[in-house]
């Protein structure tokens, strides 16, 4: 959680964007952003993240105000930790960090549900 490595943070951000989509679309969701964008986001973030963030803004509008605030805070915290633009390409070791960040963030989501 305290890791500031850019690929790790991008993985965490991807997980949050996925959760926003899942909550906004609910049972209407056939294909998730993970199905469609995971590999591209992990290899060429600069070409994918602007699109994903625009989609998230549309999805946020469908949520209750409380969930909008919750996710906006998460997005602001994660994006605020990015120290540069989205990278053009991630190396294989960086892709590994992306995957770890994604699954750490996803696990945190499931852990919170279990505790509730």
Residues covered by each model-derived region:
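Intrinsic-disorder/low-complexity detector
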Residues: 1-116
């Amino acid at each position: 959680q305290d890791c500031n490595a850019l690929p790790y943070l991008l993985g965490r951000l991807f997980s949050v964007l996925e959760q926003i989509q899942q909550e906004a679309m609910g049972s209407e969701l056939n294909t998730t952003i993970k199905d469609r964008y995971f590999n591209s986001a992990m290899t060429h973030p600069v070409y994918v993240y602007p699109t994903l963030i625009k989609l998230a803004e549309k999805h946020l509008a469908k949520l209750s105000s409380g969930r909008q605030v919750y996710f906006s805070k998460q997005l602001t915290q994660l994006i605020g930790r990015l120290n540069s633009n989205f990278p053009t390409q991630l190396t294989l070791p960086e892709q590994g960090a992306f995957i770890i960040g994604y699954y750490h963030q996803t696990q945190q989501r499931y852990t919170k549900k279990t505790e509730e």
